[in-house]
A protein has these predicted regions:
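A short, internal acetyl-CoA/4′-phosphopantetheine-binding micro-motif in the GNAT/acyltransferase core
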Residues: 364-372, 401
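Ligand-binding beta-strand-loop-alpha-helix segment within the catalytic cores
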Residues: 72-170
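Conserved acetyl-CoA-binding loop-helix of GNAT-fold acetyltransferases
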Residues: 372-389, 397
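Short amphipathic alpha-helix that is part of the acyltransferase structural core
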Residues: 292-322, 432-435
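Polyanion-binding loop/helix "lid" in catalytic or ligand-binding cores
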Residues: 88-118, 156-157, 163, 170-194, ...
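N-terminal glycine-/serine-/threonine-rich phosphate-binding loop
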Residues: 1-58
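C-terminal "cap" of GNAT-fold acetyltransferases
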Residues: 419-441
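A conserved beta-strand-loop-helix scaffold within acyl/acetyltransferase catalytic domains
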Residues: 323-367
């Protein structure tokens, strides 16, 4: 498949996401590290694309490294307690100058419209205002945070009025009090509280890495708030605040998910197109934190045998699947992948290597309450990825009742004599299954 064909195929399949995202409110956190990265101009283009597709966008920008540079250049001491900046009046003046200049620069980027740029014809309007009411953080452990503040109230109604006028709303890390004071806030705190107040469909947080990884360095593509909280509990609070922007954002995602925000996404600000990949492809790019119908696809273990047997039993009785005993399933469990939802196995499938080049996909089963939901495609992609990882060049499948499903996913019919010799010897002529093959790329 050439690049043009791949692009056309992806664009067609993105229509369901375009329709799902239209008129929804997304809150996007742009940390100071995000703004400083070379990829930020492309992030602006991708955000502009979302706007053109009808997404209502609230952008919250931080300025932590830029503020540090400004304070250091002025010879001002950087003071922190528990990872949070202590802001005095002199420092606040420098912070206001720095943040104000950054907000203007962001507006300028969204105002671009040169004929040879992706922004041509966008005509984006950016609105700013005193939408965030703040209060002082106060004294903690005997330490006075002075003009460091926290969100007291979000004027969600006023923000929505600007969104309804087709504007992008831009917020900084500054908040304002009814007495006319200005406070230095955490951008993560503002983004979280705005997303909650707006009942946003998504909170999108740009982080240094591709989301959250486990101890083996493997991406955790989905997390429930409970699982995310468990990860955060293993890390001292000071480290969460001061040493890892991903962990700060993960804590924000947990808070938002436990309130009114359906989905929180942690994606890399360094990867070109990460925002588009996360929102318009099934596999995404980073980590999704959500408590809605939480499920995850993983390698099966011996503890899953009972759940798999319960899942496949009705299909075996109907003659759709070949019968597997508990002993056989225990012996072959390493070939299986499962989708687990809240402790229940709702789908499974297996990939059996037949020779050095070919594997067999088998035992695809999905719980009757969760069919017609794309989980079969999710499993199939995972098995194909596993086959490629094992160095296989093609996969086969034998089926009695789902031939068209496999044809629609790139499989081609073959004769029994075209099967690998090992599979020919095991072929059950009584079942009379049809055989299909798919070349892997």
């Amino acid at each position: 498949m050439d690049n043009l064909t791949q692009y056309i195929d992806w664009f067609r399949h993105s229509s369901s996401y375009i329709n799902a995202h239209r008129k929804k409110v997304f809150v996007v956190l742009l940390t100071g590290e995000t703004l400083a990265h070379d990829n930020f101009s492309r992030i602006v283009h991708d955000i502009s694309l979302l706007h053109s597709l009808g997404v209502k966008l609230v952008l919250v920008h931080g300025a932590r490294p830029q503020i540090n540079d400004a304070l250091t250049s002025a010879g001002h001491e950087l003071r922190y307690h528990k990872g949070l900046r202590i802001t005095d009046s002199e420092g606040l003046q420098l912070i206001k100058q720095t943040v104000g200049a950054m907000s203007i620069d962001i507006e300028a980027q969204f105002s671009m419209g040169l004929a040879n740029s992706p922004m041509h014809g966008a005509d984006i309007k950016v609105s700013r205002g005193n939408f965030i009411t703040a209060r002082p953080l106060g004294i903690i452990d005997g330490v006075d945070y002075a003009l460091t503040g926290v969100v007291r109230k979000v004027n969600a109604e006023a923000i929505l009025q600007h969104l309804d006028k087709n504007s992008i709303v831009l917020l900084s890390n500054l908040g304002y009090s009814p007495t006319g004071e200005v406070f230095n806030l955490s951008a993560e705190d503002i983004a979280t509280e705005v997303a909650i107040a707006m009942q946003a469909s998504k909170l999108i947080l740009f982080v240094p890495q591709c989301g959250v990884s486990n101890n083996n360095g493997e991406l955790m593509s989905t997390l429930s708030p409970v699982a995310a909280e468990a990860l955060l509990r293993e890390i001292p609070a000071d480290n969460i605040q001061s040493k890892n922007g991903t962990l700060v954002s993960l804590a924000a995602a947990v808070k938002a998910s436990n309130k009114t925000v359906h989905r929180c996404h942690l994606i890399s600000f360094a990867d070109n197109g990460a925002l588009i990949q996360e929102l318009f492809t099934r596999d995404g790019q980073g980590t999704l934190v959500s408590k809605d119908n939480f499920e995850w696809l993983r390698q099966a273990t011996i503890n899953d045998v009972g759940g798999i047997l319960e899942l496949i039993a009705p299909l075996e009785e109907a003659g759709i699947l070949v019968h597997r005993s508990r002993e056989l399933l225990e012996a072959e469990i390493d070939y299986f992948k499962v989708i687990e939802m809240e402790g229940m196995i709702i789908a499974c499938a297996a990939i059996y290597p037949l020779d050095e080049e070919c594997g067999e996909i088998a035992c695809i089963a999905i719980h009757k309450h969760y069919q017609e939901s794309g989980r079969g495609d999710h499993l199939l992609r995972a098995l194909e990825k596993e086959a490629l990882k094992q160095g296989l060049k093609k996969v086969i499948v034998l089926t009695t009742q789902t031939a068209h499903w496999f044809l629609e996913r790139g499989f081609q019919p073959i004769g029994i004599n075209d099967l690998p010799p090992k599979k020919q010897q095991m072929y059950n002529y009584q079942r009379n299954s049809k055989a299909f093959v798919k070349l892997l790329r």
